Amino acid sequence: MGVTCVTQVPVLEGKSVQQTVELLSKKLELLGAEKHGAFGVDCETYHTAAAISSQGQTGKLMYVMHNSEYPLSCFALFENGPCLIADANFDTLMVKLKGFFQNAKANKIESRGTRYQYCDFLVKVGTVTMGPSARGISVEVEYCPCVIANDCWNLLMEFMQSFMGSHTPGIPSVFGTKHDSIYSPADTMVQYMELFNKIRKQQQVPVAGIR
């Protein structure tokens, strides 16, 4: 894999989530991007079991995530902590750990949509949902030939501006910790975790935007 930026795109004023996704997709196709299948990223939240919290320890959250790009892996991200990469049956282990972590089932969130290939870029435009309702839009852009974030951020930003306009993001926080080290799949999952947490907290407010 290369270096990836994950961001949220606001819903356009007077448009639905689906209509905004379609407009973004149309802009990509006009640039010459071609559809390359579908993708999905999901996240379930686990919190420290009540028995542990009652002992005076501060409650902690853990996010268990899956990404269709890595079908044999499961990612466990601790709140303000490390990212553990395990095999796909990690979910089964979490059931056995219910004395320590409990699943906050109402908080499951996921992004699903279409993958696009444009030259050396892989773009994923997804609808973020919680339960039956669409809560927002995610855009993931990967520059495939590079593995050092600092070496290609300007190129990533320039490409994102071509179809996102003024909604092009700033540098992701995870880039600040990488400096000149090699980018990894865990860095992408951290960005999705941050995006999902942001969307969980916000009301859907349409804005003027992509033209």
From Swiss-Prot:
Its main location: nucleus. One of its GO terms (cellular component) is mediator complex. Keywords: Activator, Nucleus, Transcription, Transcription regulation. The keyword Hydrolase does not apply. It holds the Pfam family Med20. One of its GO terms (molecular function) is transcription coactivator activity. One of its GO terms (biological process) is regulation of transcription by RNA polymerase II. It is found in: Nucleus. Belongs to the Mediator complex subunit 20 family. Component of the Mediator complex, a coactivator involved in the regulated transcription of nearly all RNA polymerase II-dependent genes. Mediator functions as a bridge to convey information from gene-specific regulatory proteins to the basal RNA polymerase II transcription machinery. Mediator is recruited to promoters by direct interactions with regulatory proteins and serves as a scaffold for the assembly of a functional preinitiation complex with RNA polymerase II and the general transcription factors. This is Mediator of RNA polymerase II transcription subunit 20. It comes from Gallus gallus. The lineage of its organism: Eukaryota, Metazoa, Chordata, Craniata, Vertebrata.
